[in-house]
């Protein structure tokens, strides 16, 4: 069965129903997601290279990890699930630092994929051992790239088309 997602009103309040993610994106229904930024002991940031098979934003660098919050779930639980699925990383709720909420509106693929989301942003850290054991989820993530804040800012300034655009996230990173 397709993942069910709680629907929101445009103001972020619960709409009182859930539906499958295909309908969510076909109709542009507002919903909740999570973004998780992973840092290593050297202060570098993990970016994922989205799979070339992805329907939206294939082959672009993106947040370390992200995903939908399933119906009835919490942001922290979704973040823990996505870290495990996309990176092979096991973390506990105490390992996640909540940063902020933001909204994202985007129309892709000639209007067939509409993404209207409220997202919770988290930060976590990994040891060198954890970083060495990261495993990209087939079909979701093709590779990883570690960058310092300075490297990211330089690369993003020169080649913004290589990144999924997340202005609030990138503004936060620039302030580190």
What is each PLM-predicted segment?
Residues 1-35, 39-42:
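Acidic, metal-coordinating catalytic segment for phosphate/diphosphate chemistry
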Residues 22, 59, 71, 100-105, ...:
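Nudix hydrolase/Nudix homology domain
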Residues 33-65:
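A glycine-rich, hydrophobic loop/mini-helix early in the fold
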Residues 36, 65, 98, 120-122:
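A structural signal for short, well-ordered beta-strand segments
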Residues 47, 64-99:
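The catalytic Nudix box helix
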